[in-house]
Structure formats: C-alpha cells, structure tokens
Amino acid sequence: MMPAKLQLDVLRTLQSSARHGTQTLKNSNFLERFHKDRIVFCLPFFLALFLVPVQKVLQHLCLRFTQVAPYFIIQLFDLPSRHAENLAPLLASCRIQYTNCFSSSSNGQVPSIISLYLRVDLSPFYAKKFQIPYRVPMIWLDVFQVFFVFLVISQHSLHS
C-alpha cells in the first residue's frame, strides 16, 4: 500500500493532467474555429493594405491644397512654321511654368521648374504673356493642366 502523501501527489498529478487535457481540447476547438473564420481574422490585414495607399493619396492632396507655387507664368507664342498667308487657325504653344515644391535642388534654394508645352488653337491670345506674380495653390495648377490637356484633345479631335 502507498503512503498517504504519495497517494495525494499522484492524485494531484492526475487532476493536473486532466485539467491540462481539457485546456488542450479547448485550444484545439479555438484553432478549429480560427481555421473556419480565417477570413474574418484576415480582414484587418486587407483593410490595412487598402487604407495605406488611400492615406498616401489624401496626404498628397492635402499638400497640394496647402503648398503654394511662388510664381506661375503662362506664355503663349507663335510657332516659327506659321506664315501670314496661312488661313488655318493659329496653333500656338502654351507653356505653363511653375515651381515644383516637391523636388529639392542642389543648393536647396532654387526650386526646380516644371514646364508643360501644349499646342492649341489660341488665336485670340496670340503673342500674349500672362504672368501671375502672386502665390497660387498647387491644386489650381493641377486643375489648369487638366484643362489644357482637355483643350488639346478637343482641338485634335476637331481638326482630324
């Protein structure tokens, strides 16, 4: 016959094993549920994949609304190939020039320049230069570029 203390130790060990076995069973049930519901657990990951680019776009738009260009010059000038007897509508070159606030230059003081050259029918504005000396929000320059691109496409479709 076993001593009482040894019997008590064996009983405690058996109870502990039984509790541990139940816990293992609970863990396996959890893993089974996790396997079934893995889509739900993956949703935050997919949302993060979607929201990071959206956040970057919103940050960029916020910068475009808040940053300003120190100057904004539009120059319209005649093409050298135009002759006085040519009755075709004037194809002028439009140059939009403004500072690019997002790119840094070598010395950090002179900003780089972006120029957009477009050929559009702008006869009424021939040989004019418009200079807007005050500071313009960058978003307006984006809108202006879209407008001129649309103008070029519409002119191209009219002449073809």
Curated annotation (Swiss-Prot):
The keyword Lipid biosynthesis does not apply. The chain crosses the membrane at residues 39-59, 136-156. It is found in: Membrane. Coiled coil: none annotated. It comes from the Eukaryota. Its main location: membrane. Disulfide bonds: none annotated. GO terms for cellular component: membrane. Keywords: Membrane, Transmembrane, Transmembrane helix. It is a multi-pass membrane protein. Completely overlaps YHL050C. This is Putative UPF0479 protein YHL050W-A. It comes from Saccharomyces cerevisiae (strain ATCC 204508 / S288c) (Baker's yeast).
